[in-house]
């Protein structure tokens, strides 16, 4: 995302910018919730994303996908424990935590739906189902006709 004076190139920067622009629509964590939110987001943005990429694209990274799948799963099991101890995470209002980590969890599930379904993380699964059925998700993930250079004379049409 580019502005006149700066570029936001990290997903978390873009999310923070969006929350600052319209804070009333989102659940805002306070105190210990805010600290935990930052910790979990960093865990997903760094460790989970690292292992997710190596799980999904193991041929490109020349790695063992099962090792990285298990690393992701242990992070999800940690999140499961966090959810059990912190019911605010499952608030009906979207939060910065929710917006930041659910796309990663969704990608992980899509990589192997059967494996994901067999894992013991009920809270994570419920959270993902709520995310995918939310109005926010449906609005953002609308399907569009595939862009074609020939069809659009090489121009991008929004």
Language-model-derived ranges and their functions:
Residues 130-135, 140, 151-154:
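Long, amphipathic alpha-helical surface segments
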């Amino acid at each position: 995302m580019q502005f006149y004076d700066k570029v936001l190139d990290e997903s978390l920067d873009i999310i923070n910018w969006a929350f600052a622009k319209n804070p009333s629509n989102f659940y805002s964590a306070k105190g210990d919730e805010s600290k935990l939110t930052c910790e979990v987001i960093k865990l997903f943005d760094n460790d989970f994303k690292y292992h997710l990429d190596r799980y999904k694209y193991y041929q490109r990274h020349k790695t063992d996908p099962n090792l990285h799948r298990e690393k992701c799963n242990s992070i999800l099991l940690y999140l499961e424990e966090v959810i059990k101890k912190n019911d605010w995470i499952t608030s009906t209002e979207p939060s910065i935590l929710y917006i930041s980590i659910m796309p990663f969890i969704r990608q992980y599930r899509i990589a192997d739906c059967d494996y994901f379904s067999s894992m013991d993380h009920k809270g994570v699964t419920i959270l993902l189902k709520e995310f995918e059925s939310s109005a926010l998700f449906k609005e953002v993930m609308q399907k569009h006709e595939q862009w074609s250079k020939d069809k659009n004379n090489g121009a991008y049409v929004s």
